[in-house]
Amino acid sequence: MFSDKMILIAGPCVIEGEEITLEIASKIHELVSPYADRIHWIFKSSYDKANRSSINSYRGPGLSEGLRILSKVKETLGVEILTDVHSPEEARAAAEVCDILQIPAFLCRQTDLLVAAAETNAIINIKKGQFLSPWDMQGPVDKVLSTGNNKIILTERGCSFGYNNLVSDMRSIPVLSSMGFPVVFDGTHSVQLPGGLKTQSGGQTEFIPTLTRAALAAGAHGLFIETHSHPAIAKSDAASMLPLKTFEALLPLWDQLYTCVRSFEMASV
């Protein structure tokens, strides 16, 4: 599906408007272009953040306008598009534009959503719920496979660890890999402090370099990174998104580490 390239799902958390979305996407495109032979970049952004902590928080432009903007990014940059869907109806609409449909972590056991998304024949990225063990992901995988669609990505995004905290267990990477599909590590949601700021989630971005290095060393096939030109004023997940300048600085490290781990794996076969 992605050959041996490192998968890099990257973009802003939520669509904040056409201009800034295209600006961020264009900058990521510029940064990853030198690695095009080794990194498979997929642009991500959400048209609706349906699980915001507060009723007053910005959710996004909505399905219709969001898909229009994602389509513009796709046409302008020639990049594959990923977005998350929340209902069977949204899955069918989003598949008209997006190459990859993402099942949110909180919804990863919703049978009707998984089946409807899979039936579009898009690639399905299932994010592991914070409440699930890695081996429990076989259930969601089987629901997608029941439709005949075997184009699956599994994303690890941390496990609930007491109140307002997540922990990343790197044993999850080989467990999920044993199911036969690419495993991506979500380096930004994994550093969230859910509800840690009362009406919004906090975050510890200083741990993103450590956790992403650990995940690639553990054998992850790629990374999921939410990034923004100015995270401090972003309308969603401001506390956990990676600044584009830091994203740029980490790219060569991720590339070298992924290549190194893959070379050792090939040598041991």
UniProtKB/Swiss-Prot annotation:
Keywords: Cytoplasm, Lipopolysaccharide biosynthesis, Transferase. It comes from the Bacteria. One of its GO terms (biological process) is keto-3-deoxy-D-manno-octulosonic acid biosynthetic process. It is found in: Cytoplasm. It holds the Pfam family DAHP_synth_1. GO terms for cellular component: cytoplasm. Pathway: Carbohydrate biosynthesis; 3-deoxy-D-manno-octulosonate biosynthesis; 3-deoxy-D-manno-octulosonate from D-ribulose 5-phosphate: step 2/3; Bacterial outer membrane biogenesis; lipopolysaccharide biosynthesis. Signal peptide: none annotated. GO terms for molecular function: 3-deoxy-8-phosphooctulonate synthase activity. InterPro entries: Aldolase_TIM (IPR013785), DAHP1/KDSA (IPR006218), KDO8P_synthase (IPR006269). It catalyses: D-arabinose 5-phosphate + phosphoenolpyruvate + H2O = 3-deoxy-alpha-D-manno-2-octulosonate-8-phosphate + phosphate. Its main location: cytoplasm. Its EC number is 2.5.1.55. HAMAP family: KDO8P_synth (MF_00056). Belongs to the KdsA family. This is 2-dehydro-3-deoxyphosphooctonate aldolase.
